[in-house]
From Swiss-Prot:
InterPro entries: PRMP3 (IPR026077). It comes from Homo sapiens (Human). GO terms for biological process: cell differentiation; chromosome condensation; flagellated sperm motility; spermatogenesis. Protamines substitute for histones in the chromatin of sperm during the haploid phase of spermatogenesis. They compact sperm DNA into a highly condensed, stable and inactive complex. The modification Phosphoserine is found at residue 95. This is Protamine-3. One of its GO terms (molecular function) is DNA binding. Belongs to the protamine P3 family.
Length: 103
């Protein structure tokens, strides 16, 4: 899913060059909006997939709900790492979180 997002941005680069002199502001806004939409879609797609996968592996609905927002932040910060080690990141984060709660 991240690949599709990257392709969208790549395809915009060549189209942005000729439109640069026509209307920079307009082109920039479009890029931003498309980028945001792309990130949002990516976020939802990965989150949904993560929910299903984690549900099968670990039976903890409460933990999953707490983890969802964390996954969203990770996606924006390091989308590549999320794709490669999606499950690893999720499990690694669940370990320290429960320990912090009693503290």
């Amino acid at each position: 899913m991240g690949s599709r997002c990257a392709k969208l941005n790549t395809g915009q680069s060549p189209g942005h060059s000729p439109g640069h002199s026509t209307g920079h502001g307009r082109g920039h806004e479009s890029s931003m909006k498309k980028l945001m939409a792309c990130v949002s879609q990516d976020n939802f797609s990965l989150s949904s997939a993560g929910e299903e996968e984690e549900e099968e592996e670990e039976e903890g609905e409460e933990e999953e709900k707490e983890e969802l927002p964390v996954q969203g932040k990770l996606l924006l910060l390091e989308p590549e790492r999320q794709e490669e080690g999606h499950k690893d990141n999720a499990e690694a984060q669940q370990s320290p979180e429960p320990k912090r709660t009693p503290s």
